[in-house]
A protein has these predicted regions:
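Buried hydrophobic residues that stabilize the cores of well-folded domains
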Residues: 18-267
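C-terminal motif of bacterial Sec signal peptides marking the signal peptidase cleavage site
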Residues: 14-16
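Sec-dependent signal peptide hydrophobic core
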Residues: 5-9
């Protein structure tokens, strides 16, 4: 599920038309994760560090787990994700592959230095997703996804999930406004809703609220998370974000560092 959400976001989990003016005129790349996220500048990597919040709502000690680092190619598409602890020890890593048009086509995952699975997505000659196959840590086929549809920005709109024995398990349906993810619904094999989510944004395209509702036979649980953006860099990209629960209590502060490509590196 983690990988299909990543694919859905285009990262993962992200892809709109590349609007960079200095790309080659004959480039086949149509999609860009960074453009989808409405981030500005030629970003090479993004590092997010989470911090605890004290009783007064001020930033406290750094969380021991986990610092996340996303690396991007020259087209603004994610090619590697790394999670490490406060000492810099890598805990998990995912290396992504991309289609020539920029679509996310798979990941090879490791955890604590050992294989933890992979995913490969097939793209047809029209540049459309067709099938997504996962493998477990031993390389054996695991769950797979069919009936994958996508929007004009290369983001996954819907899919059907089957287990390794080809038994239909669940399906998902996403909703977007242009390239902004607005919500997602999953249903079980008989069509009953399992979960729904919804997102809200400010006028900069920054997510300010995310709600997730989980439905079981006996209970329905909704979790609402809200965000404020405290600081931005000179390009307008946020560098500090505070997270709140549904009661308005600050629960986490994330500091973000961008590495931008130097002009000479683009030549």
């Amino acid at each position: 599920m983690k990988r299909i959400l990543m694919l859905m976001a285009g990262v993962f989990l992200l892809a709109s038309c590349n609007n960079s003016g200095d790309k080659a005129a004959d480039s086949k790349v149509k999609y860009s994760d960074l453009a989808n996220d409405q981030l500005k500048g030629d970003i090479e990597s993004i590092e997010d560090t989470p911090y605890q919040v004290d009783s007064t709502g001020k930033m406290g000690a750094m969380d021991s787990c986990c610092i996340s680092v996303n690396q991007y190619d020259a087209n603004g598409n994610a090619i590697k994700f790394t999670s490490k602890d406060s000492k810099g020890t890598v805990k998990s890593e995912s290396v992504f592959t991309r289609h020539e048009n920029g679509l996310w086509t798979g990941a090879t995952d490791t955890k604590d230095g050992k294989s933890s699975g992979s995913m490969k997505v097939t793209v047809d000659d029209k540049g459309q997703y067709t099938l997504a196959q996962t493998t477990d840590s031993t390389g054996k086929p695991d769950i797979y996804y069919t009936n994958i549809t996508q929007n004009e920005f290369g983001q996954v709109l819907s899919w059907k999930e089957y287990d390794k024995d080809s038994v239909f398990r669940q399906e998902g349906q996403g909703k977007y406004e242009k390239s902004l993810f607005m919500g997602f619904t999953t249903k079980d094999s008989v069509g009953k809703v399992k979960s729904t989510s919804a997102a809200k944004y400010n006028d900069k395209g920054e997510q300010i609220e995310f709600s997730n509702t989980t439905i079981t036979k006996d209970t329905t649980t909704t979790k609402v998370t809200k965000y404020t953006y405290d600081t931005h860099d000179d390009k307008g990209n946020w560098t500090q974000r505070t997270e709140y629960d549904d009661k308005g209590k600050a629960t986490k502060i994330t500091k973000r560092v961008y590495t931008y490509r130097k002009e000479e590196a683009k030549k």
